[in-house]
């Protein structure tokens, strides 16, 4: 997902083109409900990772004087509500292609005013889809061939510059609390301290893992 501040298309362009910006995250309720198979779509390990990631994101955004709105309601309810209350003019979000995510996106678009400018983008790939040198029907069936062609013919796009810190007046007066594991029906737990792969959530930890892996 795109829960980071650095090299983020939406964050960079919103900061560049809008006088005030706010970040929004929804804990979609149905992802934490029991399924007919007797387990949740999002269980305790993934939930802990997500909570850690949001704590990191909230801290990073606060350094830029940007509020992270954390919502326990569906985005189909929360986004239209905050668009109205905060008088939002532009909405930035990452494109997805899977059904559940697109159902949410479609519902949000139907629920908000057509005057809202919607900006969508692909920000989750090493290579941007528009930069791939293959036509759709000519993409190799074998990954190695695809990879070698991309390495030879396609350049990874440059990262977006870091945004300038907003004035403190950009922050909302309300402080949004990140839920705890217990709020989702899980008991608090701690990964084994001797684990070789603790995988703590958050972009800073992600960068550190990448650095350790490559260097």
Language-model regions, residue ranges each:
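Trp/Phe/Arg-rich N-terminal binding region typifying the photolyase-homology
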Residues: 1-157
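Glycine/tryptophan-enriched, flexible segments
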Residues: 137, 142-215
